């Protein structure tokens, strides 16, 4: 029996593997991420086919325009949770098949319309709207949907890494430089963000690490490795179970860390923080074992978390 099963009150796998026409992705991710089957496995193929024919994914694709966008043409951030950027992010989180023609068209659309002239993913196509939470979400989604070899995506991820480390990026006062921070969006290194009063934003850090952490070790540039290390150190600088990261003026903790839902947008919860840090090989860190144990204690009679 795997070690993690011994910590639960029961075996959740039969429940997780149940066919579910409302949320078919649960079975798919269980087969792939918990049981370790790759995409060539016949059951994994069937599970992903179910995603494409039932649940939310076909509903989303039915609303897509032939050109590849949702709602209106352009960069695609708005309307929030319904625009093109959000649709691509959620398609990936829901396990959509990147080889599907409509999904492929949507990815090409955002890569053609949502990148600023500095190379970063932008909410409105301008450098001042490059922001870590959106850029990380979108980068992660595009990797999941099979675009890791695309030069535009690679450049966007390199730019995100640079904005984390600050390498060669001028401050917001240097308006003659294309490669600079802005008073809006990403305002400085180490995830500084205007939406968080210019402080380092842990939500942005989690999303950035979600994307950069999916780059294979052999493909990571020294800059990306440095950004991942800085992001990991920042997320572990506080107890992830408490989530007392910098949050605007004052010292209160953002309650959204403890409100769970899926798919997940620009907000981050403690479970996604845990997911990212485990993926970055920090599972044995003392601050993570606290949170892991807390999650296991949350299991109830049927071993459902």
How does the language model describe each region?
Residues 1-305:
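Preference for long, amphipathic alpha-helical scaffolds in soluble/luminal domains
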